[in-house]
């Protein structure tokens, strides 16, 4: 049976992505990430329990909540010391929220690559959706993330990236006999783009920052921590 690591927040997007992969024959391993700006991480396990009850322990595994604060700090360190003029001159205009989301998502992906190598998993799934108005969930960025995973012989899947209608999203649960109400964690940093924002400008800046500043850091971080089990709690 093929194995897939699922970035699982307990929300509807990650839950539906999990269901779709189970239906495709995957054994799924759910992992939740905490960047230390999360509330309600305990809620995530409730979503796992619902999936386990419906699909069985053999198909659904739960890895728990893993701390990515250290990786996140390494990625944001240089950028947080830049003046606004340096950011604009070197990368273009970007909102603070979209940079935070870019660095956080990349931290999740770096940790996912490490976990996949440790557990011999060849697939990762993320519930990213174009319609959510995050720069990192647009096709231009998703394709770059696919390239990153390919370097490590891992395929990242975005099962619902083209799903635009939240009404249809809920129906996907209902037709499977699942109530579309969920318990999920809440990130305090994640703020989607305003519909009136010049999102192409921010998207292009996100791409520049990823390629020039963040991507060069990924392999050194992976090599440094590849044999370390990610932390569950801080002592």
Regions found by a protein language model. Give the residues of each.
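Nucleotide-activated chemistry modules centered on ATP-dependent adenylation/adenylyltransferase
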Residues: 1-235
């Amino acid at each position: 049976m093929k194995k897939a690591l699922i970035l699982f927040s307990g929300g509807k997007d990650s839950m539906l992505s999990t269901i779709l992969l189970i239906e495709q024959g995957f054994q799924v391993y759910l992992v939740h990430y905490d960047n230390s700006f999360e509330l309600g991480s305990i809620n995530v396990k409730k979503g796992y329990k619902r999936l386990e009850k419906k699909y069985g322990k053999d198909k659904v595994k739960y890895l728990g909540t893993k701390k990515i604060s250290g990786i996140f700090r390494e990625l944001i360190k240089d950028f947080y010391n830049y003046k606004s003029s340096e950011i604009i001159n070197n990368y273009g205009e970007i909102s603070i929220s979209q940079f935070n989301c870019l660095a956080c998502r990349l931290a999740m992906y770096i940790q996912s690559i490490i976990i996949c190598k440790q557990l011999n998993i060849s697939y990762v799934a993320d519930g990213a959706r174009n319609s959510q108005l995050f720069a990192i969930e647009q096709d231009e960025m998703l394709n770059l993330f696919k390239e990153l995973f390919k370097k490590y012989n891992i395929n990242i899947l975005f099962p619902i990236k083209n799903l635009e209608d939240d009404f249809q999203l809920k129906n996907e649960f209902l037709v499977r006999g699942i109530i579309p109400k969920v318990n999920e964690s809440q990130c305090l940093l994640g703020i989607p783009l305003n519909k009136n924002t010049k999102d192409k400008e921010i998207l292009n800046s996100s791409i520049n920052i990823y390629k020039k500043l963040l991507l060069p850091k990924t392999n050194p971080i992976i090599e440094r921590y590849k044999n370390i089990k990610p932390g569950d709690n801080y002592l």
